[in-house]
Amino acid sequence: MPTLSIIIPVYNSEKYLKQCLDSILAQAFDDFEILLIDDGSTDFSGKLCDEYASRYNNIYVFHEKNRGVSAARNKGIERVQGEYVIFVDSDDWLEKNALSFLMAQESDVDLIFYGSSFHSVNGNVTLYSPNLCICHGFSEVQEGMIDLITNPKYYDYLGFTWNKVFRSNILKEYNIRFIENLSYREDEVFTLHYAHYCKKLMILPNIVYNYRVSDTGLTKKKHTYDEFLLLSHAYQESLIYYTDKRLQEYMILQIIRNYLNAIKRISNIRKRNTIIKELWVFYQEKNIFDMSLKIKSVYRHLLCLPSAWFMNIYMSIKLLFK
């Protein structure tokens, strides 16, 4: 069995896939398997995957119908044989000796965060090198995570899976998977679910991963109210596991924001009122008005909304709960 499994979802990435795979195959550490999940590519990507698999006996290809990156990653998780798991996007690449560095870390660590560099389409490179932190026990794990996301530069560091090392036994034992019909912040939800079972976390400043900010990545996808509602519910499921107040407040803010985003996109009055009721019950259950929560950011969110829409929400709450 290999020490490391590398899961790579592939979709129409023929332009960069070779660089991605070559950066892995050139590593000094070679006790790994590569799982290429071809997510219904319509270009040459699928054939390129097959070519590499025919040349290297540690590369496995799975051709799937197009179901999205989360489904592709889940397929990979089901097939992993390694003790550790990393995710790599098919248009990105690893630094030289990245795997040797990661696999040389302490063997009892459950989750590793590492540094990365962002490469923009105009050639600019931004380095993300978080402070070194070794956290023992779930309380310290929570502290390490909140220290990252309260840092303005690293607030979105939970929102990626390609900057982390996971243990396959935790993924399998607790059936941790990506939510397949969620295409917004699904990586963060996955990480929060996983981290609950971690007893040791390492945050490393070393640059290991190169992330390509593509043209398509710069285009904002329009999300439906169903997605925002699903995301709000997913955060609520994670919330029950965490005891750190700052981390709880962070998740509560995400829950409220996503409820508001869902409500804003619902045209059906009855359905909208149902969600407003759900949000109001959440407010009351969590005693949000009595918390030292950074609720001001939610108020700022509300104040940025069109005044007519804000008044509509306000009047709906008054009518529903009078």
Describe each PLM feature range:
Residues 16-18, 43-52, 93-97:
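Acidic helix N-cap motif at the loop->helix transition within catalytic regions
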